[in-house]
Amino acid sequence: MTEAVSDVTLAKASPKPNSFWTLALGSIGVVYGDIGTSPLYALKESLTAASAGGALTQEMIFGVLSLMLWTLLIIVTLKYVLLIMRADNHGEGGTLTLMALLQSVMRRRFAAISLLGMAGAALFYGDAIITPAISVLSAVEGLKLVAPGFDPYILPLSMAILVGLFLVQSWGTAAVATWFGPLMLIWFGLMAVAGTANLMDNLHILGAVNPIYGIDFLLHHGHAGLLALGAVFLTVTGAEALYADMGHFGRRPIQVAWLVLVFPALALCYLGQGAMLLSHPERLENPFFLLFPDWALLPMVWIATGATIIASQAVISGAYSLTQQAIQLGLLPRMEIRRTSETEKGQIYIPRANWLLLIAVLYLVFAFKSSSALASAYGIAVTGTMVLTSIMAFFVMRKCWHWPAAVATAIIVPFLIIDLIFLMANLLKIVDGGWIPLMIGVGLMGVMVTWRRGSKIVARKTVRDEIDLNDFIASISVSSSISRVRGTAVFLTGNPNSTPTSLMHNLKHNKVLHEKNVILRVATEDVPRVSEDERLSYEPVNDSFAKITIRFGYMETPDVPKALVACRPLGFAFDMMSTSFFLSRRVIRQANPSEMPRWQGLLFVNMAKWSDDASLYFKIPTGRAVEVGMQITV
């Protein structure tokens, strides 16, 4: 007997909405941490590249400052704040979110869109590794101005701070995150005040607002101009965070925080540094900290260290979020995901990702030893991500917003040209360390492509060996050799219309069926979060069998037992103590010949070994899970 599919709403208390200004303050502490700490090193590195070891001139200062101000205006304000942030997927943003949005409307170009999304995600990890290293190093280096003899201790102190930061990740940041906004508000306020004070000493620097100075600088400085342009891009590293963190704070609070506070504070700080350097070019050694009087140096070093820790925390949390999305979208193997807060949806901790990030960050600090050396590796990953975002934004305009091709092209092409110019300038850094984020990006891209391809092969071979569920039910209904046992068996499967392998193996070896049998499919949708009234589909097949589909968004952590509780009002009496969950544990072997190149097959086999158990990932108690082994060759 087959009945109509029923939908159920999971009861959930709605959190009290935060006020607009509370969200804006929160965005200052999380979204703008990375871009807000760029004044520590951006102007210094840009002018160092421009002068190429020679004398620093007024023309260089005006030209570089002009490029920095207009880069902030065009890339952050016009491109991200006013355009890209419109391309949300149910309120969420980010590279993989953009990919999922396009996949839902561009099925014919699914593979191409997937490659763009995977490339953007892979490059983000390169940025996530460099940001904590360069941020903390640049802040701690300020101690050299306070105590020149402290130089030998900068590296170990920076590494100690970073180790401490990663060690406390498992505790969660909910308790201290409320302080991020106020602390960064103080940070931006101090930058604005110090910049204004120095600006008032030399108002002539305001002429740098004229874009002609920037254009003239590039036209007359050749190779040094391109190197300086690559360093100028350091002013906007972190701009992707505006889009990626949109789901946590909302579009409007992030936009208002940028226009009202962050952009003016950054502009004043850069102009103040420029004004100071016009009178004191010898201060290029560390123009940020030398904005402040001697008595304020030590407090500013500690405040800057706090700001860089906050910036690093934001990037680390972003890496966790991106990893969770990649796992849910089938781009990475399953990993343990721990929730560190019962109230904040974005508070998660992924142990394996945490330790891999820590090892990579410490390696960078040890290998490069200074923020100036690390600056050569910074920027390539971010520019690559921005190029990919521009390309995907074009397709959003055409396929989601239905804008005419001429309009979409006229808007995106200028941004894309600017992105490509910055990418070209940053590619000059490859031999000086820029190869590192590229290597990380290429490696992670290979990992994601391999996992996706191998998973498709496994799924296809699994379905090929299974039989139709209705045929199976019909065959056992006339069999008298099968014993029935009390309780409920839940069989996880990717295809609810075929008989799960775990069910066939259980019947083959144990010769029994449970009184109630549930064919359970856990689906990941192309939306960040599934509404509770669309979470669950329940379809009774007969008195002994039923089909259930549980839907999760790609930013949700699947909790199967919790979701099954919602079936009780429909007549499915879910009781954990009388329910057994049957899962297929696949042992992957490389076939000969294989459908994948040898290196890719070996990589997939090893990733499958590293993948966490399905019972752990779906929050199924170990004592209620039964794993049935099977071997598949790829």
Swiss-Prot record:
Membrane topology, from the record: Multi-pass membrane protein
Chief location of this protein within or outside the cell: membrane
Domain of life: Bacteria
Catalyses which reaction(s): K(+)(in) + H(+)(in) = K(+)(out) + H(+)(out)
Keyword field contains Transcription: no
Keyword Transmembrane helix: yes
Subcellular location field: Cell inner membrane
Pfam family, one: K_trans_C
Any one GO MF annotation of this record: symporter activity
A cellular-component GO term for this protein: plasma membrane
Alphabetic keyword roster: Cell inner membrane, Cell membrane, Ion transport, Membrane, Potassium, Potassium transport, Symport, Transmembrane, Transmembrane helix, Transport
Main function: Transport of potassium into the cell. Likely operates as a K(+):H(+) symporter.
UniProt record similarity statement: Belongs to the HAK/KUP transporter (TC 2.A.72) family.
Name of the protein: Probable potassium transport system protein Kup 2
Organism of this sequence: Rhodopseudomonas palustris (strain ATCC BAA-98 / CGA009)
Gene (name only): kup2
